[in-house]
Amino acid sequence: MRIGIITQPLRWNYGGILQNFALQTTLKRLGHQVITLDEPIVPNRSILRWCFSMAMTTLRALKNRRWPCYFPFLIVKKYHATIYRHTERFVEQNINVMRNTNHRRLRNADFDALVVGSDQVWRKIYCEDIGISFLEFAKNWTNIKRIAYAASFGTDTWCNMRPWQVKRCARLAAKFDAMSVRESSGIALCKQHFNRHAMHVLDPTMLLDADDYLAVSSQLHLNIGANSLFCYVLDTNPNTTAAINDITARLGLTPFYCMPKYTDIITCKEARQNLDQSTFPPVEQWLQSFATASMVFTDSFHGTVFSIIFNKPFWVIGNKMRGMARFNALLSIYGLQDRIISPEELSSVDLNTPIDWAPVNAIREQWKQKSLKFLTDNLK
């Protein structure tokens, strides 16, 4: 089948890039032709929607007594070629992608199926146009399969949608041939708001094995010592810094990182003045960080996922701002909920507590077969 994938934009997010790489790889191995329909940095908007967006931006800025930033996407676009050059190269070399997709101009005749997912495609705050994630552009298409694979709401509660938006999404969801979600909490959300049954499946990255990721990253060698702690932290704060210092001191580990010094190119002047320190390292380096590390400390969902894939002992500090439902759903599958720690309980945790990987890997294989069956049953 000729399949188009709708997911979050493929820019710098390592987990977002690799979940799409994994889903494409899996679908290709199942015999399909696959392309990811990537969104542009500057969104395709009608004049009316653009004016509405500008008005809302102004109102929010006045309410918060801030100078409004009208064109954040244009700021990112200006520096895009530099700060995303490594991640963009990985995408171009490893993912079949249509860049700057204007979804309204896609043709029905070019596709046999559309797959939405994975990642937080149904989390409104991360979607420029939530209708795209429910295939509104294809609502009148015929002879097309509409599938959601491991779609995520990001949280376990319904939020950030007005009643009319919910009705709009429900009408579009009714057209889907099959739905699956990445978190168990998504099953209830689909039933409550869309009146649709959804299956709980694995994040696409877990459909591949460590060897698959080593195959695309082994050409990059990291000179990391034997006793190392890979610190993949998205939201650095005093708590995460204190936790890293505590873990390294107690276990005698050397911390290392795979993130730029500056990550906010829009509002941070220093980031724009120091582009080398704002550039995201290669995806291959990120993968090799897991392969090389003795232990992983993270507040990232996919940081947790890849720790499991590479069978590395790990500790997760809860990231409530980004959504704890994802972590709880993932770790409950494997009985690893005790790997989530809070700053308050860190001092009382035995950081040398091992993980028995044999049952974890057996569970992952069972879920992998279940998830693959969802794809094979619904894409034929």
Regions found by a protein language model. Give the residues of each.
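Leloir-type glycosyltransferase catalytic cores
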Residues: 276, 332-380
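Catalytic donor nucleotide-activated moiety binding site of glycosyltransferases and closely related
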Residues: 147-154, 187-190, 240-280, 342-348
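Nucleotide-sugar donor-binding and catalytic loop/hinge architecture
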Residues: 1, 110, 139-143, 214-228
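Donor nucleotide-activated moiety binding/catalytic core segment of transferases
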Residues: 198, 202-206, 210, 263, ...
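A short beta-strand/loop micro-motif in the catalytic core of glycosyltransferases
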Residues: 176-183, 297
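A donor-sugar binding/catalytic signature common to diverse glycosyltransferases
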Residues: 289-329
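Aromatic- and Gly/Pro-rich donor/ligand-binding loops
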Residues: 5-14, 18-171
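Acidic anion/phosphate-binding donor-loop and adjacent secondary structure
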Residues: 157-161, 206-220
